[in-house]
């Protein structure tokens, strides 16, 4: 947002989009509620949806598609008192131990991943000493035990010897547990005349964001180029063909990804 403002964009914060209308080449309208409660309707040739999983544009269009071949869910919560992954409590004092060898950087300051049959777990250190701990699992391979999301998360964490050790004296932050029953989704279209969806608003694969951010970046750059071409006067029929090709190829890319 800072970069956008430096490039001449007018940034409203806080603000909330309360309605919008897509009218193709005739233009689009977006109604925004500002911090003081006033509502302003602006018109634009292009609307870019970057609302994350809220996916305002796609939900209004009805273009969201589930990924039936990748039935994953996730639970996550912040913990206090997680052990130091490089500390003696976990690593021990024997430098010949396979878990201690060849460790150059501090694992405590990095995102660490632990895997098991049908699932993977993340440990992400946060400011203030808390650690985000999350679970992603494939419902075809694993059904975590428990009645509540926290109980299900705890059952898997307790079943993994290393995460069980890491959380021996840790406590979850009360009221912080979150659950998503269906993680991945795609859109039937990512761009068309006058609108596009980017980032998680354009689809979501997995919380493993290392490849996920690559996919987002590819999509943003390609759609930016198409918007610039359209604004520079490229023929509508030519752009329509380009949009169709992009939608088909990007969906194939995400499916393969």
Give residue ranges: language-model regions:
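Predominantly flavin-linked oxidoreductase catalytic cores and closely associated redox partners
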Residues: 3-165, 220
């Amino acid at each position: 947002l800072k970069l956008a403002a430096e490039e001449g964009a007018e940034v409203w914060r806080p603000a909330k989009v309360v309605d919008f209308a897509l009218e193709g080449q005739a233009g689009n309208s977006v109604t925004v509620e500002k911090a003081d409660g006033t509502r302003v309707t602006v018109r634009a040739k292009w609307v870019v949806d970057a609302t994350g999983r809220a996916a305002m544009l796609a939900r209004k269009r009805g273009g969201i598609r589930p990924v039936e071949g990748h039935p994953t869910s996730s639970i996550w919560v912040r913990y206090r008192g997680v052990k130091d992954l490089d500390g003696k409590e976990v690593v021990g004092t024997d430098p010949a131990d396979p878990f201690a060898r060849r460790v150059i950087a501090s694992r405590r300051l990095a995102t660490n991943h632990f895997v098991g049959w049908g699932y993977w777990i993340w440990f992400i250190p946060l400011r203030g000493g808390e650690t985000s701990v999350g679970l992603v699992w494939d419902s075809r391979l694993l059904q975590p035990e428990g009645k509540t999301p926290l109980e299900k998360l705890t059952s898997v964490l307790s079943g993994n010897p290393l995460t069980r050790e890491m959380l021996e004296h840790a406590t979850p932050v009360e009221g912080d547990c979150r659950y998503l029953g269906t993680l991945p989704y795609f859109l039937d279209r990512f761009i068309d005349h006058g609108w596009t969806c980017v980032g998680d608003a354009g689809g979501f694969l997995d919380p493993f964001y290392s490849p996920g951010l690559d996919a987002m970046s590819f999509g943003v750059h390609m759609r930016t180029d198409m918007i610039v071409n359209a604004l520079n006067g490229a023929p509508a029929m030519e752009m329509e063909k380009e949009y169709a090709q992009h939608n088909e190829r990007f969906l194939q890319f995400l499916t393969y990804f």
